[in-house]
A protein has these predicted regions:
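Short hydrophobic segments within beta-strands
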Residues: 101-103, 126, 176
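Nucleotide phosphate-binding/pyrophosphate-handling subdomain across enzymes
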Residues: 4-122
Length: 181
């Protein structure tokens, strides 16, 4: 099977993260089919779309770097599939200490997600301001059962602020667990 990415050497994608390789392949596979259906997609349009996808779509939070020193990354991965990619990506980072700010909604596979998260991190359990948000105390209890330790914060800004205050420049802060965080 021919790799469609070969048709676009040096293709730059604004979205980062290991899972984007698979997403890129899927999109590039669809382009010839879209052309057959009458869509006029030039190579330049494809390259521009990949390079500026966040600006063009408003998409945020896909392994999005918000800060350096300490590195602060957010990702909207919120299920076992997404968290699997995120934990692989975290293993490839270098840092002194990992700070994980996690919040989830109550209708996801919380046990499955928590089982995948790194145990050596310091956790900041929080919740989004949506009705389906799992209370941070419940999340912390479930996380403790999965071997994850940390403290509770009533909202995302206070969790982020505390993690930043406790971090050194060579640390890594991750924010995720829900699209609403």
């Amino acid at each position: 099977e021919e790799d469609e990415k070969d048709d676009y050497p040096g293709l730059e994608c604004e979205l980062k993260g290991l899972y984007q390789t698979k997403n890129t392949r899927t999109l590039l596979t669809a382009i010839p089919e879209l052309r057959k259906a009458g869509y006029n997609l030039s190579e330049q349009a494809v390259r521009s779309g990949f390079a500026h996808v966040c600006e063009l779509t408003g998409l945020m939070g896909r392994w999005q770097k918000l800060q350096d020193a300490p590195t602060l990354i957010c990702d909207t991965g919120h299920n076992v599939g997404g968290i699997t990619y995120i934990t692989e990506q975290l293993k490839q980072q270098s840092y002194r200490k990992l700070h994980m700010i996690i919040g989830m909604v109550n209708d996801k596979d919380i046990h499955g997600v928590l089982a995948l998260l790194p145990q050596e991190a310091e956790y900041y359990f929080t919740k989004a301001s949506v009705r389906r948000a799992l209370p941070e105390s419940e999340l912390a209890q479930l996380a403790s059962e999965a071997g994850l330790q940390g403290n509770c914060y009533p909202d995302v800004p206070s969790a982020v602020r505390t993690a930043q205050e406790k971090s050194l420049p060579e640390d890594f802060i991750f924010v995720g667990g829900s699209s609403f965080i």
